[in-house]
């Protein structure tokens, strides 16, 4: 939808970091907020992070185990984007995943 740059807080990723397995996951907290759940407290590989700057209209695809995050938006520009998560039909999708909202879902009456 819009350019994602270092200045407006683009994603950063650890090349090859998905090969180390899932070390932590973002989950929905009991209070409705979000938190990290540590699955493996061993250190991440010593790999330099790279910015994933993307121009408007770019599709960015990440492996589910790839360590990634976005930095703060330090500019006067917005950083709107669509995020689509695909999960195989037979996959175990934890109920506490951060994308799961508290039930009952509101606004669909």
Task: Name every feature range the model reports, one short phrase each.
Residues 4-66:
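Double-stranded beta-helix
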């Amino acid at each position: 939808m819009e350019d994602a740059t270092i200045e407006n807080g683009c994603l950063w990723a650890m090349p090859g970091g998905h090969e180390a397995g899932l070390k932590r996951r973002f989950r929905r907290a009991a209070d409705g907020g979000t938190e990290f759940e540590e699955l493996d407290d061993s250190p991440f590989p010593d790999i330099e992070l790279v910015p994933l700057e993307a121009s408007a209209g770019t599709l960015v695809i990440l492996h589910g185990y790839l360590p990634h995050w976005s930095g703060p938006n330090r500019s006067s520009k917005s950083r709107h984007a669509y995020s689509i998560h695909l999960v195989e039909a037979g996959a175990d999708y934890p109920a506490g995943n951060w994308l799961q909202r508290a039930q009952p879902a509101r606004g669909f009456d």
